């Protein structure tokens, strides 16, 4: 019997996922739809799900069936069911819903002879003695990662976590002193000269153990630490501050040390054609030397800029005496209609290229 001729098993709401190749064979698709009740069965195309054109409702279906393609294999189905599509299919299943890889057949039943995608294992989806195809095994792994589990029948099912109930933890009541961890309220200690220690008095008896009665006001399970027993050494208060003498590191250096030249390491010495950068924690003087050079260069640059500054009474002359010499845009001599926005000749009449034009204190002289 072909997979499309397998009768439907169980009841509930079904979702049929069809590969696009099956739509070109309407007789096969209609035969599959005829095996299920139309009012409780939905049909979706896998390629539309993969492209995100349609979405599946949440927690709606009891059984999702992956239909075989036109060649009666699951090769096309496995190729279209990506991780995102499979996660959407799992979300559309109700708790306890089933995912079956053929037309209402459980995992491991039937065969895919055309593509070699799986073989009968006799025991369902848990894996049998015969070798499964890599595509089917990869699909099973993705299904498990998506949240499905194999039930006792070998079917991929969505676990029902709603049946679980929270169990409160009841803490026991306070035990009486007689039922505490100390038993009858005494602790057996090694004997010391046959002395039994009790709550009221100390008596000498020929016993070999010492019994100490626990104070009845002490809660069960509470231990006390005696900090006073330090073998005669007094305890130091935490608030007591130790006097620490601060040492100025500059006082450790004398005049001879301050006048001693700094020995520059060989790796820090400048090399020809390359300026070495100073270390972050430089102590050889290279950092100070480079900073001094930078300051000198900066001062020289500022001094050079000062000499180039022009005052308001200085003459700013643009010489066009060279025949054919024009501005960078080439339109300065053509008039305002052809001049740039920041052209110094805006407002001036057109002049011939080569004509001397002088701007002197905002007075135009041609």
Swiss-Prot record:
<keyword id="KW-0411">Iron-sulfur</keyword>
<feature type="region of interest" description="Disordered">
    <location>
        <begin position="100"/>
        <end position="136"/>
    </location>
</feature>
<feature type="binding site">
    <location>
        <position position="343"/>
    </location>
    <ligand>
        <name>[4Fe-4S] cluster</name>
    </ligand>
</feature>
<dbReference type="InterPro" id="IPR031838">
    <property type="entry name" value="Dre2_N"/>
</dbReference>
<dbReference type="GO" id="GO:0009055">
    <property type="term" value="F:electron transfer activity"/>
</dbReference>
<feature type="region of interest" description="Linker">
    <location>
        <begin position="168"/>
        <end position="258"/>
    </location>
</feature>
<feature type="binding site">
    <location>
        <position position="340"/>
    </location>
    <ligand>
        <name>[4Fe-4S] cluster</name>
    </ligand>
</feature>
<comment type="subunit">
    <text>Monomer. Interacts with TAH18. Interacts with MIA40.</text>
</comment>
<comment type="function">
    <text>Component of the cytosolic iron-sulfur (Fe-S) protein assembly (CIA) machinery required for the maturation of extramitochondrial Fe-S proteins. Part of an electron transfer chain functioning in an early step of cytosolic Fe-S biogenesis, facilitating the de novo assembly of a [4Fe-4S] cluster on the scaffold complex CFD1-NBP35. Electrons are transferred to DRE2 from NADPH via the FAD- and FMN-containing protein TAH18.</text>
</comment>
<feature type="region of interest" description="Fe-S binding site B">
    <location>
        <begin position="329"/>
        <end position="343"/>
    </location>
</feature>
<dbReference type="GO" id="GO:0051537">
    <property type="term" value="F:2 iron, 2 sulfur cluster binding"/>
</dbReference>
<dbReference type="Pfam" id="PF05093">
    <property type="entry name" value="CIAPIN1"/>
</dbReference>
<feature type="binding site">
    <location>
        <position position="282"/>
    </location>
    <ligand>
        <name>[2Fe-2S] cluster</name>
    </ligand>
</feature>
<keyword id="KW-0004">4Fe-4S</keyword>
<dbReference type="Pfam" id="PF16803">
    <property type="entry name" value="DRE2_N"/>
</dbReference>
<feature type="binding site">
    <location>
        <position position="332"/>
    </location>
    <ligand>
        <name>[4Fe-4S] cluster</name>
    </ligand>
</feature>
<dbReference type="InterPro" id="IPR046408">
    <property type="entry name" value="CIAPIN1"/>
</dbReference>
<feature type="compositionally biased region" description="Gly residues">
    <location>
        <begin position="119"/>
        <end position="128"/>
    </location>
</feature>
<feature type="region of interest" description="Fe-S binding site A">
    <location>
        <begin position="268"/>
        <end position="284"/>
    </location>
</feature>
<feature type="short sequence motif" description="Cx2C motif 2">
    <location>
        <begin position="340"/>
        <end position="343"/>
    </location>
</feature>
<keyword id="KW-0408">Iron</keyword>
<keyword id="KW-0001">2Fe-2S</keyword>
<dbReference type="GO" id="GO:0005758">
    <property type="term" value="C:mitochondrial intermembrane space"/>
</dbReference>
<feature type="binding site">
    <location>
        <position position="284"/>
    </location>
    <ligand>
        <name>[2Fe-2S] cluster</name>
    </ligand>
</feature>
<dbReference type="InterPro" id="IPR007785">
    <property type="entry name" value="Anamorsin"/>
</dbReference>
<protein>
    <recommendedName>
        <fullName>Fe-S cluster assembly protein DRE2</fullName>
    </recommendedName>
</protein>
<keyword id="KW-0963">Cytoplasm</keyword>
<keyword id="KW-0496">Mitochondrion</keyword>
<feature type="short sequence motif" description="Cx2C motif 1">
    <location>
        <begin position="329"/>
        <end position="332"/>
    </location>
</feature>
<feature type="binding site">
    <location>
        <position position="268"/>
    </location>
    <ligand>
        <name>[2Fe-2S] cluster</name>
    </ligand>
</feature>
<feature type="binding site">
    <location>
        <position position="329"/>
    </location>
    <ligand>
        <name>[4Fe-4S] cluster</name>
    </ligand>
</feature>
<dbReference type="GO" id="GO:0046872">
    <property type="term" value="F:metal ion binding"/>
</dbReference>
<dbReference type="GO" id="GO:0051539">
    <property type="term" value="F:4 iron, 4 sulfur cluster binding"/>
</dbReference>
<feature type="region of interest" description="N-terminal SAM-like domain">
    <location>
        <begin position="8"/>
        <end position="167"/>
    </location>
</feature>
<comment type="similarity">
    <text>Belongs to the anamorsin family.</text>
</comment>
<feature type="compositionally biased region" description="Low complexity">
    <location>
        <begin position="108"/>
        <end position="118"/>
    </location>
</feature>
<dbReference type="GO" id="GO:0016226">
    <property type="term" value="P:iron-sulfur cluster assembly"/>
</dbReference>
<feature type="binding site">
    <location>
        <position position="279"/>
    </location>
    <ligand>
        <name>[2Fe-2S] cluster</name>
    </ligand>
</feature>
<keyword id="KW-0479">Metal-binding</keyword>
């Amino acid at each position: 019997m072909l997979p499309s001729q397998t009768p439907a098993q169980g009841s509930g709401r079904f979702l049929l996922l069809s590969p696009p190749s099956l739509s070109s064979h309407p007789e096969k698709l209609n035969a599959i739809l005829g095996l299920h009740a139309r009012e409780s069965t939905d049909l979706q195309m896998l390629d539309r799900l993969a492209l995100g054109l349609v979405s599946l409702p949440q927690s709606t279906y009891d059984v999702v069936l992956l239909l075989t393609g036109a060649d009666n294999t699951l090769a096309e189905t496995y190729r279209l069911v990506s991780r995102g599509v499979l996660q959407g299919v799992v979300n559309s299943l109700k708790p306890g819903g089933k995912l079956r890889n053929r037309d209402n057949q459980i995992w491991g039943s039937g065969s895919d002879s055309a593509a070699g995608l799986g073989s009968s294992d006799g025991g369902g989806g848990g894996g049998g003695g015969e070798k499964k195809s890599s595509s089917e095994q990869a699909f099973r792994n993705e299904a498990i990662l998506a949240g499905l589990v194999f039930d006792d029948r070998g079917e991929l099912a969505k676990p029902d976590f709603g049946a679980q109930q929270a169990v409160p933890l009841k803490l026991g009541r306070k035990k009486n002193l007689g039922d505490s961890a100390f038993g009858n309220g005494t602790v057996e200690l090694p004997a010391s000269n046959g002395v039994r220690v009790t709550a009221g008095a100390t008596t000498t008896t020929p016993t070999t153990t010492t019994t100490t009665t626990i104070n009845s006001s002490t809660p069960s399970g509470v231990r006390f630490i005696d900090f006073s027993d330090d073998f005669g050494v007094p305890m130091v208060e935490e608030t007591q501050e130790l006097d620490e003498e601060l040492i100025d590191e500059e006082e450790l250096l004398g005049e001879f040390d301050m006048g001693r030249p700094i020995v520059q390491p060989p790796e820090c010495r400048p090399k020809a054609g390359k300026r070495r950068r100073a270390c972050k924690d430089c102590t050889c003087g290279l950092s100070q030397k480079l900073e001094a050079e930078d300051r000198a260069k900066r001062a020289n640059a500022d001094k050079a800029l000062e000499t180039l500054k022009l005052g308001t009474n200085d003459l700013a002359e643009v010489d066009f005496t060279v025949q054919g010499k024009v501005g960078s845009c080439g339109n300065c001599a053509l008039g305002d209609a052809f001049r740039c926005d920041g052209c110094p000749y805006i407002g001036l009449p057109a002049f011939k290229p080569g004509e001397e034009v002088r701007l002197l204190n905002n007075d135009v002289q041609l």
